[in-house]
Structures are given as structure tokens and as C-alpha cells.
Regions:
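Basic, Lys/Arg- and aromatic-enriched nucleic-acid-binding interface segment
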Residues: 6, 27-94, 98
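Conserved tyrosine-mediated DNA breakage-rejoining catalytic core shared by Y-recombinases
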Residues: 34-35, 99-140
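Short, basic (Lys/Arg/His-rich) helix/loop patches that form interaction surfaces
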Residues: 70-75, 176-217
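DNA/chromatin major-groove-contacting recognition/catalytic segments
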Residues: 126, 138, 233-256
Length: 256
């Protein structure tokens, strides 16, 4: 199985990582070797209605950002930029990151308008400054290109379901292989993937006090019911914070 192969590769990959740190082999060579790890297969039809508990805390996100700042492998650095873009673009799904076109981005209004691949519905996402910063970086190297990120070919026909599936499945595999290596190197207790960016945004937003209905709209869920089902375990913390806001007024009504 893929898991057995990955287990067998682990000692080799660790040895290569150590050799790279000791400058015994080139960083780029090591990066290619690390990408031999087999990533989990992703289906475009997978609904994100099952939360596997994998999300990054603020500390883990900071560690990932620190890794990015010192990363010397160009392609891996690009994959990390895509991960951070997905997070900052309100948890944009990986398939929509891949198929994002410059025509979908309005820099003046600071928003993204796109028909989501999964739901086939038009979705408007407000773009934060970090998301815009990443887009500007890619604008410099993707001038004249149809798609924002170089994950699919410019001639990809989005109406060709089979071609879209193959292109996105291959791209997802490449990104997740690279991210899995990064996750291991920063000591994450789970496998890092693009979908973790989506869950991380949702958890951050809920714990910052955004309402379930707002988070649901930002994620592009069909209904609030889906969002509640997926992130129900994070509601108590948010609800406790809401009740805490009543503390001062309630204190004067306390029975003593």
C-alpha cells in the first residue's frame, strides 16, 4: 500500500534531509528526493463535510511561515505561497486555487469573483491584504497567462470534466507531496495538505468570533447546516466567549 511504501522510505528521506543540512548534498536534490513520498489520493467529489481535526494553530502557522522564509527550493516555496493564499482567501478550495484566473480578480475592489468548481455557483470572496500581496507576487511572473498559479496548462478546458479531473488530481498530488515533507520538517503531528489551509481558516474565523453564517458564506458552503456539522466542536469556545461579553451586565443581577 501507499502507507507501507512511505514507511519504508522514511529512513532514506530522513538521511537525505540530514545530508542536506550538513551540506553533503544539494538542497534542490534533497527536495526532489523528499517528493518521492506518495501523497493521499484526492477526489474532486470529496465533500468537506467530514472534519478530520487537521488544522494549524497560530503557532504552527507561524512555524510554517518561518520555514517559508528560509526555504531554498523554488517550487516548494511556490507551493507554500499557494497554501497561504488558500488560507488568506477565506479557505478557498484547492481546485479553485488551481483554476483561479486573472479575470476573476478585481484588485480595485479587493475581491475575487469565481464560479466554484465544486458547487458550480458564483462566489464572491473579499481579498485580505496578505492574499493580495501573494497575487501581486504572481502577477510579476505570470503576466499574459490565463491562470494565476502555474498548476494547470493555460489551454485547460474547464468544461471538459475528465481533463479537469486529471489536471487537478495531478496538481493536488504534487502540492500535497511537497507540503507533507514541510509538515514533517516543522514537526506537525499530522500530514500537511492544501485542505488543511481551508480548515485552518474556518477554525481561526470561528474562534475570532465570526458567526457561523458568515463563515459558511465565506467557505462557499451550500448551507449553514454543512458548516455547523463540520465545525460543531469549535462552537463551544465561540459561544463561551459570547456569553463572557454579558458578564459585566449580569453581575449586577446576581443573587447574593
Amino acid at each position: 500500500s501507499d502507507a507501507t511504501i512511505n514507511h519504508a522510505l522514511t529512513p532514506i528521506l530522513k538521511a537525505c534531509a540530514y545530508a542536506s543540512e550538513m551540506k553533503m548534498i544539494d538542497h534542490a536534490v534533497n527536495a526532489r528526493i523528499q517528493d518521492m513520498r506518495i501523497a493521499s489520493k484526492i477526489s474532486l467529489s470529496d465533500e468537506d463535510n467530514e472534519f478530520d481535526g487537521k488544522y494549524l494553530s497560530k503557532e504552527q502557522m507561524s512555524a510554517l511561515l518561518e520555514y517559508y522564509s528560509t526555504c531554498t527550493e523554488p517550487r516548494r516555496k511556490e507551493f507554500l505561497e499557494m497554501f497561504f493564499f488558500a488560507f488568506h482567501a477565506c479557505g478557498l478550495r484547492v481546485v479553485d486555487v488551481m483554476t483561479l484566473q486573472w479575470g476573476h480578480v478585481n484588485f480595485e475592489k479587493k475581491e475575487l469573483r469565481k464560479i466554484m468548481i465544486k458547487t458550480n455557483k458564483r462566489h464572491v470572496i473579499p481579498l485580505t491584504e496578505p492574499a493580495l500581496h501573494i497575487l501581486h507576487r504572481w502577477q510579476e511572473k505570470r503576466a499574459g497567462c490565463r491562470y494565476v498559479f502555474n498548476l494547470v496548462k493555460d489551454d485547460l478546458d474547464l468544461d471538459d470534466a475528465e481533463a479537469l479531473y486529471k489536471a487537478c488530481n495531478n496538481a493536488t498530488k504534487c502540492i500535497n507531496q511537497s507540503l507533507a515533507v514541510v509538515g514533517e520538517q516543522i514537526g506537525l503531528p499530522f500530514t500537511l495538505s492544501m485542505h488543511v489551509a481551508r480548515h485552518s481558516f474556518a477554525v481561526f474565523a470561528l474562534n475570532k468570533g465570526l458567526s457561523m453564517s458568515v463563515v459558511s458564506r465565506l467557505l462557499g458552503h451550500g448551507s449553514t447546516d454543512v458548516t455547523e456539522k463540520v465545525y460543531a466542536k469549535f462552537l463551544p469556545e465561540t459561544l463561551s466567549a459570547e456569553v463572557a461579553r454579558l458578564k459585566e451586565d449580569f453581575a449586577s443581577l446576581e443573587i447574593v
